[in-house]
Structures are given as structure tokens and as C-alpha cells.
Swiss-Prot record:
Subcellular location: Golgi apparatus membrane; Prevacuolar compartment membrane; Endoplasmic reticulum membrane
Role this protein plays: Required for the lipid transport activity of the ALA/ALIS P4-ATPase complex.
Subunit structure: Associates with ALA3 to form a stable complex. Interacts with ALA2 in a heterologous system.
Membrane topology: Multi-pass membrane protein
Modified residues (N-acetylserine): 2
Region (Disordered): 1-32
A Pfam family that the UniProt record links to this protein: CDC50
GO biological process, one term: phospholipid transport
Organism annotation: Arabidopsis thaliana
Protein's recorded name: ALA-interacting subunit 1
Alphabetical keyword list: Acetylation, Endoplasmic reticulum, Glycoprotein, Golgi apparatus, Membrane, Transmembrane, Transmembrane helix
Length: 350
């Protein structure tokens, strides 16, 4: 009885081994040089010639780019006028916050002198300093769905504390919209008005996709504490470009935002009179306000950093290339020389 069962049990065991081996083989991934990391690779040896040539090529590319970038930046004509302190009457400078929160006249006149001929278009910016739009609570205090669609005007959960007024939703809600910049500028030259075009200052993608054409302001700036500018309740949010520009928050505490464009040339030596309303409260957080008039170049606005960065990197690479060249010529070293091994250089070394 037992002898007759032995072959069958051994056959079953062999069958199970074969089936388990087949299962393992069926799950094995297809062999390829890519999955096994066996692709051919080139590993260049860093010989002195290669190192010197690399540094030299970088310097030859970067130094001219730095010079070109600096020249492009120097072609930009810029007028910057800080007015937050100058537009406070002497009698009120001891308590600037009380002045800016008062109801008195805050009109101020500034005179700007054009240093060089400025070709159109001339961009008018306002610049704020020490204003942290990147604060987490500030950045989150908005409702993108509410800005896009009138159906979502009640989506105000993220907008506290500027979410509703009298139980009705505020549109647009949140701290970003509530703190909308509200200083205004009226420019003139030779006693004639200088038109500042405020159309087309916002990104087209923001106007078309982030702010609805059928969404209108509601209950905006009706609270006890006014944060900034008011909005026209008869204009859809997609047409309120000052708001759209402001809602694109800045990453750094010093930033500029586009106010408008001057579409006529300004000649050297001309006096530009600016009548401004100093309404925006930057005094509570020791902020600064500046009015900026600027042209542009093919590289953008005035920014010396890019050119200086290119010149610095190119100069360092050139110095390193020169140093390695001198070392190679004065004290050359044969590649792969075993005398430089530690146990050959130091007696008894390991």
C-alpha cells in the first residue's frame, strides 16, 4: 500500500515545484538594459585640459551676456518718488496713523523732473515696501470660485474676517480684496493733463479665466473699518483691472504693481506735476509708498541684478581657468601617476 503511493506523492511534489517556478518566472519582469541599469554611459575623465576649457567656455558666454544685460538695464529710464512721508503735513507727522485714518483732505502735489527722454509706452507703477502679501493668512483669504461665477457667491468659508456683511456675502470677499490699494494719481505737464491709460494693465488670462463677466461687487467696503479702495458695483469684476492686478499677490515684501500707461513721449528736463490722493495706510506697519515712472527695454524693466550675476559667475570662472592654467604649466602632473597615491607619498601610509 505504501509502496504504491510513493511515486504518486513524489510526482505531486515535483509538479508543485514546477508550478511555483512557473509562477515566479511569469512574474519576473522582462529583461532590458534600461531596467537593469546596464545602458552604455560616457564618464569623461576630468583632465586639466577639460576643466580649464569648461571654465573658459562658461566665462566667454557669461561675461558678454552680463555686459549686454547691464547695457539693456541702463537704457531704461526710471523716475522713483517716495511720497508717503512728504505728503503728511508737518503738524500731523507725530501721529501719521491718526492723520491717514481721518476724514480730512489728503491731496498732495509732487513735481517730477524727467532725467532723460522717455519713449512711450511709459509705465506708471505704485511701489510698496514692508508689505507682506505672501503672509499665509493673507494669501488664503480669498474665494477663487466666487470671483469666477455668480453661482458661487456664497463660497466664503476661506474669507474670514471679511466674509459677510449683515449676513450677506461680500463680493469679492477676503483680506486681499479688502486691502485694495486706493491712492490715486493725476499727471500733467505744462499745465496740460497727461492721460494715464488704465486699460490693459491686467493679465489677459486673469481677466478671462479668473474673474467672471457676470460677477458684480456686493456689500464691498461696507464694514466699520475700510481697508482700501471701493469698487464700482455696476462693473463686472473682469473689467475692474485695478482689482485684478492687486489680487495677483507678490512674493516679496517690496513690490510694484502696474497703475497705468502713458502713451506719449516725455522729453528731458520736462516737469511732471502729480496730484495724488494719499489715502492708503502704510503707516500702521512702517511701510513705504513710491510712485514710479519707467520705460522698458527688450529685457524688461530696470534690473541690474541679472547683468551683475552673469558678470560675477563669468569672472569667477575666468579666474579659476587662469589659476588652473598657471598650476598646470608651473607644476604639471602626469595623469594616473602612481607616485601620488597616499601610500607612496607618505612612508608607511595606508
Amino acid at each position: 500500500m505504501s509502496s504504491s503511493n510513493t511515486p504518486s506523492s513524489s510526482a505531486a511534489a515535483a509538479g508543485s515545484i514546477d508550478s511555483s517556478a512557473a509562477r515566479r518566472n511569469s512574474k519576473r519582469p522582462k529583461y532590458s538594459k534600461f531596467t537593469q541599469q546596464e545602458l552604455p554611459a560616457c564618464k569623461p575623465i576630468l583632465t586639466p585640459g577639460w576643466v580649464i576649457s569648461t571654465f573658459l567656455i562658461i566665462s566667454v558666454i557669461f561675461i558678454p551676456l552680463g555686459v549686454i544685460s547691464l547695457f539693456a538695464s541702463q537704457d531704461v529710464v526710471e523716475i522713483v518718488d517716495r511720497y508717503d512721508s512728504a505728503c503728511i503735513p508737518l503738524s500731523d507727522r507725530a501721529n501719521k496713523v491718526a492723520y491717514i485714518q481721518g476724514t480730512g483732505n489728503k491731496s498732495c502735489t509732487r513735481t517730477l523732473i524727467v532725467p532723460k527722454r522717455m519713449k512711450q509706452p511709459i509705465y506708471v507703477y505704485y511701489q510698496l515696501e514692508n508689505f507682506y502679501q505672501n503672509h499665509r493668512r493673507y494669501v488664503k483669504s480669498r474665494s477663487d470660485s466666487q470671483l469666477r461665477s455668480v453661482k458661487d457667491e456664497n463660497q466664503i468659508d476661506a474669507c474670514k474676517p471679511e466674509d459677510d456683511f449683515g449676513g450677506q456675502p461680500i463680493v469679492p470677499c477676503g483680506l486681499i480684496a479688502w486691502s485694495l490699494f486706493n491712492d490715486t494719481y493725476v499727471l500733467s505737464r505744462n499745465n496740460q493733463g497727461l492721460t494715464v491709460n488704465k486699460k490693459g494693465i491686467a493679465w489677459k488670462s486673469d481677466k478671462e479665466h479668473k474673474f467672471g463677466k457676470n460677477v458684480f461687487p456686493k456689500n464691498f467696503q461696507k464694514g466699520n473699518l475700510t481697508g482700501g479702495a471701493s469698487l464700482d458695483p455696476n462693473k463686472p469684476l473682469s473689467d475692474q483691472e485695478d482689482l485684478i492686478v492687486w489680487m495677483r499677490t507678490a512674493a516679496l515684501p517690496t513690490f510694484r504693481k502696474l497703475y497705468g500707461k502713458i502713451e506719449s513721449d516725455l522729453e528731458k528736463g520736462e516737469n511732471i506735476q502729480v496730484t495724488l490722493q494719499n489715502n492708503y495706510n502704510t503707516y500702521s506697519f512702517s511701510g513705504k509708498k513710491k510712485l514710479v515712472l519707467s520705460t522698458t527695454s527688450w529685457l524688461g524693466g530696470k534690473n541690474d541684478f541679472l547683468g551683475i550675476a552673469y558678470l560675477t559667475v563669468g569672472g569667477i570662472c575666468f579666474v579659476l581657468a587662469l589659476a588652473f592654467t598657471v598650476m598646470y604649466l608651473v607644476k604639471p602632473r602626469r595623469l594616473g601617476d602612481p607616485t601620488y597615491l597616499s601610500w607612496n607619498r607618505i612612508p608607511g601610509g595606508r
